[in-house]
Amino acid sequence: MYIVYISMIALVFLVWFAVCLYICCSVPLLPSVHLCAYMWLLLFVFIVVHTTPLQMFCIYLLFFILPMWFLHILSVYA
């Protein structure tokens, strides 16, 4: 059961990263337009998966801030 739980979380965040990648590459100068949708997704994951605030902060850094920073750097220097 724990393996299925972890793989489901991994799948959700892989799909989320793909969506972030697509949106940020399509509109590289306006990622803040989609910030509300990302925040709702973070809230959804927090409620459904029942993560702790520390885990949620790590998830926020790894799957939101770092990809957005990477894509911003990529769009600026590409």
Swiss-Prot record:
<dbReference type="InterPro" id="IPR004270">
    <property type="entry name" value="Papilloma_E5_alpha"/>
</dbReference>
<dbReference type="Pfam" id="PF03025">
    <property type="entry name" value="Papilloma_E5"/>
</dbReference>
<keyword id="KW-0244">Early protein</keyword>
<comment type="similarity">
    <text>Belongs to the papillomaviridae E5 protein family.</text>
</comment>
<protein>
    <recommendedName>
        <fullName>Probable protein E5</fullName>
    </recommendedName>
</protein>
